[in-house]
Swiss-Prot record:
A double ring-shaped homohexamer of HslV is capped on each side by a ring-shaped HslU homohexamer. The assembly of the HslU/HslV complex is dependent on binding of ATP. The gene is hslV. It catalyses: ATP-dependent cleavage of peptide bonds with broad specificity. Keywords: Allosteric enzyme, Cytoplasm, Hydrolase, Metal-binding, Protease, Sodium, Threonine protease. Belongs to the peptidase T1B family. HslV subfamily. InterPro entries: ATP-dep_Prtase_HsIV_su (IPR022281), Ntn_hydrolases_N (IPR029055), Proteasome_sua/b (IPR001353), Proteasome_suB-type (IPR023333). GO terms for molecular function: metal ion binding; threonine-type endopeptidase activity. Its main location: cytoplasm. It comes from Shewanella sediminis (strain HAW-EB3). Gene3D superfamilies: Glutamine Phosphoribosylpyrophosphate, subunit 1, domain 1 (3.60.20.10). This is ATP-dependent protease subunit HslV.
């Protein structure tokens, strides 16, 4: 699977992801880019789950962002409604972590939209490791959101066999 982590602190939001693509117990690719900028570079998005499924979701989510002029919450809720009602989408196995300058959200494979506490998101096979590390760093250091995301992803990659050390990191400063 993968690890995606998003951290918000001091007018900065970051989404970071590793690059490993696995098929069963085999590493197929080590430098996949699972974090992207959407809607005129104003929205960050990362995915965990099936790669083809995630690209389908990225396309649909970007269309919703365009439809709602970049309003993240409205686009996410509309995407979730589609996910629940569209037979094809219901079969997609992926999670999206999305963020802009106002909020951070998880869009789940069940069609749920979750705004996490503390604006900390972690999804994927190494998500619990990354979340634990990021929580400790948020509570006990003055590191930037970028530094916390990078360090927590490194820790997850050291522990989770489905997460590697190749990182894609996108940040928004506001």
């Amino acid at each position: 699977m993968t690890t995606i982590v998003s951290v918000r602190r001091n007018n900065q939001v970051v989404i970071a992801g590793d690059g490993q693509v696995s098929l069963g117990n085999t590493v197929m690719k080590g430098n996949a880019r699972k974090v992207r900028r959407l809607y005129h570079n104003k929205v960050l998005a990362g995915f965990a789950g099936g790669t083809a499924d995630a690209f389908t979701l990225f396309e649909r989510f970007e269309a919703k962002l365009e439809m709602h002029q970049g309003h993240l919450m409205k686009a996410a809720v509309e995407m979730a409604k589609d996910w629940r009602s569209d037979k094809m989408l219901r079969k997609l196995e992926a999670l999206l972590a999305v963020a802009d300058d106002t909020c951070s959200l998880i869009i789940t494979g069940n069609g749920d939209v979750v705004q996490p506490e503390n604006d900390l998101i972690s999804i994927g096979s190494g998500g619990n490791f990354a979340q634990s590390a990021a929580t400790a760093l948020l509570e006990n250091t003055e590191l930037s959101a970028l530094e916390i995301a990078e360090k927590s992803l490194t820790i997850a990659g050291d522990i989770c066999v489905f997460t590697n050390q190749f990182k894609t990191i996108e940040e928004l400063n506001y």
